[in-house]
A protein has these predicted regions:
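Conserved beta-strand-loop-beta-strand hairpin that lines the nucleotide-binding pocket
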Residues: 117, 121, 134-142, 187-296
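C-terminal output helix
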Residues: 93, 111-120
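Receiver (REC) domain active-site loop signature in two-component systems and cognate sites
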Residues: 62
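Two-component/phosphorelay signaling modules centered on CheY-like receiver
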Residues: 18-36
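Active-site beta3 strand of CheY-like receiver
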Residues: 51-57
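Acidic catalytic/metal-coordinating carboxylates
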Residues: 39-43, 66-69
């Protein structure tokens, strides 16, 4: 994705590794941004307090102040630029603290410097959205209230998928597709893309299963009335919903519920069908490192 700033947006790059700091700063400068560099957390915080930045790339493990300490102090202050956390530390505790402190995105090192330009373009084109509320931030139980925007849904999907890094790639990607579709359905249809409304989501992990619960603020729905989805079509017209989606001007698709049903081991809706529980059982070979056992 290309992004040419009309006015040079200001970006701070903070990393104690000189090579990384130089590579990212250089790529961002070539893309037309006004870049300031900092070699440790204390210098990064001083820069943020003195100047107005649109975006900050922040390494976690830096001398004097860690990136997470800087993030917490920034959130308590008046200047609150969007912050991209970048680190090789992929532990659940670090990731969850980044979510709690309202990090905008989380980049896992190593990554190609050009990815910083793509992330910057994506972050800077988005308006500021309401806070993501953290209800629980334990590795085995994450529960959040997120604003009903596609941007928030995409961010949280990216964060939570990183929590499942111990799963095989194909399994994690498959589960991720289902969770993303549930989340987008919730913000689009239940929340009507109203950023002042919230979707409540929970991710629960034990050694034997991965569970997602998604509750949207809408009145619910009936499968019989889903003219815009493949699941609501007669057998002789399985893709009639595509015409409906064109007429309504909504994103291509409509196969989401059908796909989710195929992926889930259990899919449970409440009576109004504005809450859903997705369950995937994990085999011993799927990997369980870093998880917490749910007490029996």
């Amino acid at each position: 994705m290309s992004h040419t700033p009309v006015l040079a947006e200001r970006i701070l790059v903070a990393d104690d590794d000189r090579t990384t700091r130089f590579a990212i700063s250089s790529m961002l400068k070539k893309a037309g941004y006004a870049v300031t560099a900092a070699k440790d957390g204390a210098e990064a915080l001083r820069n943020i307090q003195k100047k107005s930045f649109d975006l900050v790339f922040l390494d976690i493990w830096m001398p004097k102040l860690t990136g997470l300490e800087v993030l917490a102090r920034v959130r308590a202050g008046e200047s609150r630029p969007k912050i991209i956390i970048m680190t090789a530390d992929g532990t659940p505790e670090t990731l969850l603290r980044a979510i709690r402190e309202q990090a905008y995105e989380y980049l896992s090192k190593p990554f190609p410097p050009k990815e910083a330009v793509e992330v910057a373009a994506r972050a800077l084109k988005q308006d500021a959205s309401p806070r993501i509320e953290v209800i629980s931030a334990q590795p085995h139980w994450v529960e959040l209230l997120i604003p009903c925007t596609r941007e928030a849904a995409e961010r949280i999907h990216s964060f939570l998928m990183k929590l499942e890094a111990d799963l095989p790639d194909d399994l994690r990607n498959t589960i991720g597709l289902a969770f993303k579709e549930l989340l987008l359905n919730a913000v689009e249809w239940g929340g009507k893309l109203d950023p002042n409304r919230k979707v409540r989501i929970a991710q629960v992990r034990s050694s034997r299963m991965l569970l997602y619960r998604v509750a949207d603020p809408g009145p619910g729905f009936s499968f019989k009335g889903l003219t815009h989805a493949a699941v609501g079509q007669p057998a002789d017209e399985p893709i009639a919903h595509t015409n409906v989606r064109d007429q309504l001007g909504i994103r291509p698709g409509g196969f989401g519920i059908t796909m989710i049903r195929a992926i889930a081991d259990e899919l449970l809706y409440n009576e109004a069908q504005n809450e859903v529980i997705f369950i995937k059982y994990l085999t011993a070979s799927a990997g369980v490192s870093g998880t917490a056992e749910v007490p029996s």
